[in-house]
Structure formats: structure tokens, C-alpha cells
Amino acid sequence: MKFFLVIGGTGVMGTSAIRAIREHFDQNSVIIANWYGKESPGFQIEGADNTIFGDINDLSCREQIKSFNNGIFEYMFYATALGDVGIPIKDATQEQIDRSNKLSFNPIPQLENELDITTIVAYSTFYTIRHQLSTYGAMGHSKENIEKWTVASDGTTNHACIRAGLFESPSSRGIKLLLRKTSKNLDNLKDPLLRSYFENTPSSEGIKKFEEGIFKEEKEAYGDCRTDKEDLMRAHLELFKSDNPIFVNVCGKKIWPSKEPLLLKQFI
């Protein structure tokens, strides 16, 4: 019997991981899924055998997790994140980066130390494309930390990362909302690429043009775009089938492996 841990089990990536586990592994697999937000008594995450509500930074939440199978898990999927977005990555302050890392990165090595996990899967994006460099803010630094961690395994626990193209998520919606608000005064948009989408254009139309710009850049760089839930699930299945994968990239229908992290110093 294999135990699987999903942190952030209600999000797009978390639900994709759960679906992929159910499809790939046998029915005796046990999934423990964690979520945090506005508490809903009795809520159970679909596809999970046990649901744990709580902030992963709280000791009581981690102790609950450890109570399952003595803290021994075949896989952990770390699918939660929170950080300041809507500003250029290069403009994020250290305070903003630290705040983003608190949930988006720091718990990963902490859980690696506290639990007995065979493989940890984290998540990233193509944050070095021009559109992401101009809007991904502090989250870009947290994702870089994840990518550096992915290639730094000491062999005790396997590290893997699914790097995905733009898909609809709380983070992408947050960026669009912040851009809509910021664009009301064009002086707030210092980045010339961003500014070009909103000049002499209603903010709602500017957001659409911005999103189309991301899709166009992704397609030019990686061969496809418009990543959806099915694509994300297929990326997980590809990871399960691979022999010691490092990065599994997914952009639209295209999925491919790679070994090198994206380093911001080459772009900012």
C-alpha cells in the first residue's frame, strides 16, 4: 500500500495530481490531501482518502500529516503558493520575496526533513519569458528557489518539478486583477511591453491583449500554448512513467523533459 501526500489539494495542480495518481497507481493507494482557506466543516477533497485542513506552516497541521503511515510517503506534491504578483520580477523587494517564500517555497525542504518521502514533486512555470518577467513579481523568485532545489537533491529524496505554461489559476487571475487596477493610471506601468497593451485601450481589452501576448510568446518559444487541466494531468502521468525525471515541461499539448533550472540572473 502506497501513501501519497498532496499539499494544496483543492487547486488546479493539486486536483491534477490526485486524478493522475488514481489513474496510474493501483486502487490500494492512499491519498492524504491538505488544503487551507475559509474553513468548511466536513469538506472532503474529491479523490482523496483523507482531507486535512490547516496552514502547512502550523506545527499542528504537520503533526496531523505525520500521523498517517508514520509520516512515510511514496510521493509528496507541493501544489500551494502565495506571493506578491503584478509587478516585474526584478522589482520585487526582499520583504516581498521572503513573504512569498514563506508558503511558496520554505515548507518544501522543511517537509522533506520532517517526513520520510521517496519523491517530492514541486511546480514551476516559464517565468523567464518576457511577459512573466514583467508581471510575476516575488513569485518569480520563489519559483527560481524551487528550480534550484529541484536539481540539488542529495539522493535521500528524489526531487522533481513540473514546469507549466499559463493556465487559469488564482495566481493568473490575481495578476490580471492587479494589472487592471494598475492600468487605470498608465504612469504606474513602467514596463514598455505592458504599457503597450493598455495605451488608448479599455483595461478589460488590455487584459485580453496581455493574455494573448503570453500565449503567442509561449507558442513561439515552446511550440504550443493554452495549457489546461487535462494537459496538467498528462504531465503528471508522464512524470510517473519517467525514470528519475528532473523537470517535466508542459505547454499546451506539448510535454517534454529537461534537466536545467531557469536562472533569473540570465534575464534580469
Question: Whereabouts are the PLM-identified features?
Answer:
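N-terminal Rossmann NAD(P)H-binding glycine-rich loop of SDR-like oxidoreductase domains
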Residues: 5-26
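Short-chain dehydrogenase/reductase
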Residues: 7, 98-106, 135-153, 225-227
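Rossmann-fold cofactor-recognition segment
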Residues: 43-61
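NAD(P)-cofactor binding segment of oxidoreductase domains
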Residues: 62-68, 94-118
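Conserved NAD(P)H cofactor-binding loop of Rossmann-fold oxidoreductase domains
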Residues: 76-86, 124-125
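Conserved mid-core segment of classical short-chain dehydrogenase/reductases
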Residues: 81-98
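Catalytic loop of short-chain dehydrogenase/reductase
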Residues: 119-156, 160-196
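C-terminal helical subdomain
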Residues: 159-161, 180-265
